C-alpha cells in the first residue's frame, strides 16, 4: 500500500470484509471504483472506512443476546511470559468491562470461584473438551477501530488496560465461560494495533473457525444452562435440548498443541515484524504467540458487561511457540491449527458437541461476522452443509456452448448434440432456403449458421491423420544416400518409346503389346555401365493424358522421344506441357534416324518453337540422336542421362518408413488388388502396414519389374505390392504407418469424409433445374455402359475418352467401372439399367457368359483403345434418329386442265426440268406459293400409264385428293431420303 493511494482489495483486507462490500460502500459515497484492483485516495479511503463502520455497527445491534459458553481445559502455567507482555497492552486496551481493572489482584480467587462453576458442564461439552485439550477457545473480534465501531456503539469503545505481569501470574483455568449476551464487550477483547500482526500469522486458523456459529446458538445456550446447574459432575454425560435463540455471531478459536508448533516460531516472528507497521486488519486468530504463553489471571472484574459471566477469566497461560504461518493464499486448515491436531478422532468430535471448521472465505482468507452462520446442519450431528462461495464483484460472462463438427454432420446428429429437436433445425434450414431432411448432411458453413441461431458455436474438429502419419521433416545430410534417377519416356504414339526402352533393357516388351502400342504405364529398373536407372514407360495415345501427367509428377528426368520422320506431333506438345508443369528437365531423343526421310533439322526447328532450343543453337536442351532398331546412339543417351542425374544430386534417406506413389493399380484374379508403387523415400519391407487413399493394407508380397519376389525396396525402386484392401487410384500417395490398426483407422476416416463431401456437394433441386432437366432428358439419348478393364489406369483413360465423345444429343453414362474381370453382378447391373458391358483386356468366365445370355446383355471386348472409341462412337450415333433429307426430282408446268368423270381434274403438263416419277411427292406452286403438298395419283403419256416422264415431254397428271388445278401452276416433284445421323 502506497502513502497516498490504497487498493480496494487492500482496504477490504484491512477492514476484514470482502472487496464487494468495500465497492458497495464506495458506490454509496459516489466514489468511482470498478473492481478490487481500483485505487482510492487517502481521503476516499477514510470516507469508505466510516461508511463500513456505520454499516457494521447497525448489523451488530441487530444481533441477539444469548449466553455463549466456551470451555477450556486447565493447562500448566509453564509457558513463557514474553508473548503476553508484548500483546497484553494491545489486548487489554479495548477491554470493555468497567469492572475489569478491579479484577487485577483477584486472579487466584476468581479462578477458584470459576472452576467449581465450570465443572457441572454437560456430557457432550466435556467430550468436546477432551478432544480439544490443547486448543483453548477465545472469542475475539476485529482489532481495527472500524471493526470496533461495527461491533458496538461508540460510547463503549474505551476500557481500562490490563497489565501484562498480573495476567502472567494468574493460575491456569479449567473452563472459561463467555457471556454471549455481551457482544459489544466481546468484540473489544483483542482490539489493538499490536495484535494485528498476530491476526495475519494464522489466517488459516481463523478461516477455519470463522465458518458458521449462528446455527449453534441453541447448543451454546444449552451449555450455559448446564454450567449453572451442575457443581461437580465433570465426568457426567448429559444431553440438553437445543433451543433456537438469537445469539451473537462469534468466532471460537482453539489453540494447537504448543509442542507441535515450535518449528514455525521463527518464520512467524519474522512475518509479524514485517507486517507490524501495517494498519490493523481485524482480530487475532487463536494460536500460540511466537514468544511464549499469554499471561493468565482473572479479568478485571468478575464478569463482562452484559448478562453476567459465570466466572472471571482464568489465569492459564497460553502455550508458547509460533503461530501457524498461513498467508492469504494458503490452505485453510494447517497441520497444527486443526481441532483434531491433538489426536482426537472425528467420530468423537461429532457426538453432540459444537464443532468449528475453518472456512476459506473473504478476501485474504478473512470472513466477515455478518456472513458467519447458516452452514451448519442441526438435524444430524457432525454434518455440515456445503459452504456457499462468495459471489464475484464482476458478472461472469456466459461460456460459449460449442458443437464439434467434422467435415459435415447429419441433421439428426446435429440436433442431438445441441439438445434440440430435428424439426426445429429443419425449420431454420427452410428459412435459409435449404430443403433438408433429417438424414441429410450439412457442411460446416451451413452448420455454423444454424448453430448460431441456437446460441452455439461450431468448432471444426475431427480425426487428424497428421499425428499418425510420419512427419515429413527434412533429413540430415549424413542420412541421405545417392539414389537412382527416375526417367520417364514420353512422346507421340508410334514414335518408338517402348522400342527404345527395349533396346536399352535388351528385352522385347513391344512383342507382347496389343496393336504394337503401349496402353499401360510400366516401371523398369535397368542396370547400365553408368549406374542404375529407373524408367517409366508411358502411353502415347491421346486417351492416356492422365497417365503421362502421373509419370511426369514422380520423375526426375523426361526423355522426349520424337521420330525423325514425323517431327513434333500433338501428344509431343502435350508431353512437353506435362514436363514443364512438373518442373522436370527434358532430354530430347530423336529416334528413327536410320529411316529414309529422317530430317533432324526439322525436328530441331519444331522443338525450338516449343522453347526447347538445342545446345547446338545456343540453348540448354540436350539432344541425342538414336535408333532403337540399330541401337545407334544409345550409349550417348545413357551418358547424357548419367550426367544430368549427377547434376541433380539425387539423394534419399533409406532408413525410414517408406513413402511413394501408385504408378498403376489393377485387380488380379488370383492375387486380389495389386498396385505398382514407386518408392520415393525410405525402404518398403515385407509386412509393413500402409495407407493409400481410402484403402489400407499390409505388404503381403512384393515383385520387381521382372516378376521376381523382393523382400524390400529402397528409394527410386518400382515394385508391385500385393495386399491392398481395394484397388487404389493411380497417382495416390503410398505411406507406411506403424501398424495396421492405425492404417485402417486413417483409411476409414478418409472414406467417411469423402462420402460426407459427396453428399453435401449434391446440388439442390429447384423448379427451374427440374424442368430444364426434363426437357433435356426428353431430347437427349443416353448410352449406359458398364466398364471393366485390367488396370485402374486404363479405366480412367477410357472413362475420360468416352466423356469427351458425348454430345448434347447423346450422353454416355458409365454406371459402373472398375479394374478386374467381368462378374455376375456386373451382368445383373447391366440388365437392370439397359447397359452394354465393355471389357478392356478382360474376358468373362463361361458361367458369366451364360448369365449374360439369359439376361440378354451385350458384352463387347476390346484390347486396343482406339477401336473401343470408334465402336462406342458408332453406337452413340446409332441411338440417334435417322436424318430425313429431301431430294429434288423435277418440275412440270400445267398447260391445260381436263375434267374426267369419276376421276377428277387432270392436268396436262410439260416437263420443264428433271423428271416426274409416279407415286412421288409433289408440291403445287401458284405464283411461287405452295398451295398443295401430296402425291401423284396417276401419270399417263397419251393413254398409257408410265412410271416416269423425262424432261421435254408432255404428260397427264392427276393429284391425290386435289382438283383445284389451274393453268400456269407449277408441279414440283421430290422424294425423302433417310440418312444415318452423326454426332457432329
UniProtKB/Swiss-Prot annotation:
PANTHER family: TR-TYPE G DOMAIN-CONTAINING PROTEIN, TRANSLATION INITIATION FACTOR IF-2-RELATED. One of the essential components for the initiation of protein synthesis. Protects formylmethionyl-tRNA from spontaneous hydrolysis and promotes its binding to the 30S ribosomal subunits. Also involved in the hydrolysis of GTP during the formation of the 70S ribosomal complex. Belongs to the TRAFAC class translation factor GTPase superfamily. Classic translation factor GTPase family. IF-2 subfamily. Keywords: Cytoplasm, GTP-binding, Initiation factor, Nucleotide-binding, Protein biosynthesis. Residues 482-651 form the tr-type G domain. The gene is infB. Residues 126-136, 198-220, 271-283 have a biased composition (Basic and acidic residues). Residues 89-123, 154-172, 187-197, 255-270, 308-334 have a biased composition (Low complexity). Pfam families: EF-G_D2, GTP_EFTU, GTP_EFTU_D2, IF-2, IF2_N. GO terms for cellular component: cytosol. Residues 627-629 are annotated as: G5. One of its GO terms (molecular function) is GTPase activity. InterPro entries: EF-G-like_DII, EFTu-like_2, IF2_II, IF2_N, P-loop_NTPase, Small_GTP-bd, T_Tr_GTP-bd_dom, TF_IF2_bacterial-like. It is found in: Cytoplasm. Residues 591-594 are annotated as: G4. This is Translation initiation factor IF-2.
